[in-house]
């Protein structure tokens, strides 16, 4: 089987609070949610040997970042509002040329707007932070890579990795 070399080429963004706008060619950077499992150090309470990490069973908070060229004054009206943001990218396999969609959807708040300093010759940019993410889905070519909503267990590659725990706790 040939190795794949997939690269995201282009991306667009939409916000449910601004239904008539699509942000596309102005996106310079997009920071997708980092999936980080929570761990705590355990030193063995005096036992010899190295400190070990124990999974807490909790993921770290999800955040996203966005850097766009220009001044988007309409986004100030969305600041602190709960909205559904959708980011759609074109992922191309550099080996085969096959293109597939990559979509990230997050129910969250626009929690940060940081204008960069404007210099005389460069383009003005703004950094945006999406915070208080209460639901997130990452889907590539119709396949769920990650899915989660507040009060639900996370799914990785479409599988609830906490299904056994949920059953023991009577959550299913």
Role assignments for model-derived ranges:
Residues 108-172:
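Mixed-charge, glycine-accented linear interaction segment located at domain edges/termini
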Residues 70, 76-104:
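Short, acidic/charged, Gly/Pro-enriched secondary-structure junctions
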Residues 52-72, 122-135:
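Oligomerization/assembly interface segments of phage tail-like spikes and tubes
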Residues 1-39, 158, 164-172:
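Polar/acidic, low-complexity leader/linker segments enriched in S/T/G and N/D
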Residues 56-58, 79-81, 98-100, 120-124:
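A generic structural micro-feature
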Residues 52, 75, 94, 113-120:
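Catalytic micro-motifs at enzyme active sites that drive phosphoryl/nucleotidyl and oxygen chemistry
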């Amino acid at each position: 089987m040939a190795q794949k070399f997939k690269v995201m080429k282009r991306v667009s963004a939409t916000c449910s609070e601004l239904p008539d706008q699509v942000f596309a060619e102005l996106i310079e950077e997009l920071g997708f949610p980092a999936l980080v499992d929570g761990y705590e150090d355990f030193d063995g309470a005096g036992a010899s040997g190295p400190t070990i990490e124990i999974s807490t069973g909790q993921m770290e908070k999800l955040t996203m970042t966005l850097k766009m060229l220009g001044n988007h004054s309409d986004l100030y009206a969305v600041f602190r509002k709960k909205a559904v943001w959708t980011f759609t990218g074109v992922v191309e396999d550099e080996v085969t040329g096959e293109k597939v969609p990559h979509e990230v959807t997050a129910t969250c708040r626009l929690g940060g707007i940081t204008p960069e300093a404007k210099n005389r010759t460069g383009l003005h940019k703004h950094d945006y932070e999406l915070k208080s993410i209460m639901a997130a889905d990452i889907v590539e070519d119709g396949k769920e890579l990650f899915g989660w909503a507040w009060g639900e267990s996370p799914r990785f590659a479409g599988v609830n990795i906490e299904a056994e725990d949920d059953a023991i706790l009577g959550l299913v």
